[in-house]
Amino acid sequence: MAINIMAAFEETPPPLDFVFNGFLAGTVGALVAPGATGKSFLALEAAFAVAGGVGADLLGVTPKHTGKVAYFAGEDPENVLITRLHSLGHHIDPAARENVAHSLILEPVMGNRINIMDEATIAALVKGCADCRLIVFDTLSRIHQLDENSNGDMARLVGVLEYIAKTTGAAILYLHHVNKGSARDGQTDQ
């Protein structure tokens, strides 16, 4: 449906719903960096902040509202994830630990061959994440079977992520590696 331009001119819009500064609910964002630079730890800490609130905000991202977080970890096995949780848990207060334990779903999906382009997978994600504030996919390459060098394939993939974000109202954060050539040549913005 088209925007009513006159209404937009005349009526005060509702406040924007930021999950954390600069990241709107219902949108898709990316954390892109070379491998082994801490993307997963950073994303997990952001998930802690949203799930646990002030006492779990190790990054200082100050989420406006807490909420449920679904984190799909495709590159690390369960024992590594448990080690990270144990380590981070020492840095948050007991009440925040309870909030994180209640509101964070950390799903190890390494080796599960997820294909987010599959309609049944999309439907399951929309249903399972309907009450989420944040959804994290770590990493993008582990949730599809498309050609990452194809602009068309990647546009379709981002379209699916946008659909899930719009349908659930959650912000979606995906982690992605820059290609090896770009990282080697110092062109990490590629």
Features from the language model and the residues they span:
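N-terminal pre-Walker A segment at the start of P-loop NTPase domains
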Residues: 1-19
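Pre-Walker A (Motif I) flank of P-loop NTPase domains
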Residues: 25-29, 67-68
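Hydrophobic positions on the alpha1 helix immediately C-terminal to the Walker A/P-loop
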Residues: 42, 46
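Gly/Ala-rich phosphate-binding loop of Rossmann-like dinucleotide-binding domains
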Residues: 51
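Phosphate-binding/switch region of NTP-binding enzymes
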Residues: 30-32, 36, 40-41, 72, ...
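Conserved inter-motif catalytic segment of the P-loop NTP-binding fold
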Residues: 14, 19, 54, 62-152, ...
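Walker A/P-loop-proximal flanking segment of P-loop NTPase domains
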Residues: 22
